[in-house]
Design a protein with these regions (language model features):
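FIC/Doc superfamily catalytic core
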Residues: 1-167
């Protein structure tokens, strides 16, 4: 899981080296320079990976929205405030709630400059319920390989983007 955590966290801007990541996750030690947040994020990522592995190994347990929210809470660790500058230059802030579905719309600018809007906050709980039901039924039927099931789940999940941050 060192390689997964290292690469996943670097996509989010984590500055730890591979060696620092390995030392932290395998031996619980810290070496060299690094932001405290980066070390904490890496440890939280490892906890989340372990939670997913344990959940996957427990074949008697179906996937639930509660597990997804608990996993998100473990990954983010705590609520925090996000600060942004709007195109008009106005400063704004809002709280990211760990383990809670989004309360604000979220979107991304595509490589073509278009804005892609994810599911609205109002739609999100029902869409997540549908997604979890679909996943559990698809797993029960066994018609998809684990890789196909994971890929389709991830695609549908990312299209919803249920949290304000930490959806990756």
């Amino acid at each position: 899981t060192v390689e997964y955590n290292y690469n996943s966290n670097h996509l989010e801007g984590n500055t730890l080296t591979y060696g620092q990541t390995e030392l932290l996750l395998l031996f619980g030690k810290v070496s060299g320079e690094g932001r405290l947040k980066d070390f904490n994020d890496m440890k939280a990522s490892e906890v989340s990976v372990r939670m997913m592995r344990e959940e996957a190994e427990n074949r008697q347990q179906q996937l639930t929205q509660n597990f997804i929210r608990t996993l998100h809470r473990a990954l983010l660790r705590e609520d925090y405030t996000e600060y942004q500058t709007l195109p008009s230059g106005v400063q704004t802030s809002f709280v990211i709630h760990a383990g809670q579905y989004k309360t604000r719309p979220n979107s991304v600018i595509t490589r073509y400059g278009d804005r892609f809007e994810y599911a609205s906050p109002e739609e999100t709980p029902a869409l997540m319920s549908d997604l979890v039901d679909w996943y559990n039924e698809a797993e029960r039927k066994g018609e998809l390989t684990p890789v196909e099931l994971a890929a389709l789940f991830h695609y549908r999940y990312i299209r919803i983007h249920p949290f304000e941050d930490g959806n990756g």
